[in-house]
Amino acid sequence: MGWLDFNSNSKKEKGKDDARSSFSWGDNLNATDWQHYTDPRTLIPTLLLTTTILFSTRLYRSYLRRIPEATHIRPGFFRKRSLFGTVTRVGDADNFHLFHTPGGRLAGWGWLPGRKTLPEGKDLKNKTIHVRIAGVDAPEGAHFGKPAQPFSAEALAWLRDYIQNRRVRAYIYRRDQYNRVVATVWVRRFLFRKDVGKEMLKAGMATVYEAKMGAEFGDFEAQYRAIEKEAKKNKLGMWSGKKKDYESPRDYKTRTAAAANILK
């Protein structure tokens, strides 16, 4: 019977101990298991969730974020975006205040709790966008001690009846010197969408905008001028008086501004 080689066994055990000692618990805990992150069961849901969050954020900021006032409109929105909302006040015959309701009824405006009714009165302060209807100029009302133009009251009443408390869509061009948004405005009347500026010209409640600087028409200038010509021919609204007594809103503003400068 041969002698057992205890030295050989002890060498094997020593080798195992050396192998174990080369791995520390700290190294094992700090190691990153990249295989876990690249596993399709983890990677695909993570990518889908991230994409959904980014898309939802962009959608909200571009289309569903409510804009309280004209000064909050980003420059990049002009000529690229439209504003949908309810007309809360018509203070002049060619401009009004709009409460922006992005997304309309699909976004809960008019029925969802918190959006079922719009603010009223003093609660609307600093919450509406002042809109100037593009391409038209209505007779001037009495302001700052200046007398009203003929047909200014009729034009104001017409616009109030046409858009007050109605939902409209404004295709915005720029912000003017009075912090109003110049826009072509559309309103749904029965089953049809109507261009508010165009309808004012048809009724003889406004002229084509005559200022040399800052005029905005979108793609409708030729149409507007043709419609104004037809209203003149038919003596509608402000064209119903004698030609010699007519003064355009632009001429009125120029004359009254000159008179005010003389008095200074």
From Swiss-Prot:
Active site positions, chain numbering: R132, E140, R180
The compartments listed are:
Mitochondrion; Membrane
Question: What is a single Pfam family found in this protein's UniProt entry?
Answer: SNase
- For bias type Basic and acidic residues, the affected ranges are 10-20
Leader peptide range in chain numbering: none
Q: What is this protein called?
A: Probable endonuclease lcl3
Q: Which residue pairs form cystines in this protein?
A: none
Q: What is the species listed in this Swiss-Prot or TrEMBL entry?
A: Sclerotinia sclerotiorum (strain ATCC 18683 / 1980 / Ss-1)
Q: Spell out where the chain crosses the membrane.
A: 42-60
The residues that the entry says bind Ca(2+) are D137
Q: What is its EC number?
A: 3.1.-.-
Name the protein family.
Belongs to the LCL3 family.
Q: How does it sit in the membrane?
A: Single-pass membrane protein
Keyword Transmembrane carried by entry:
yes
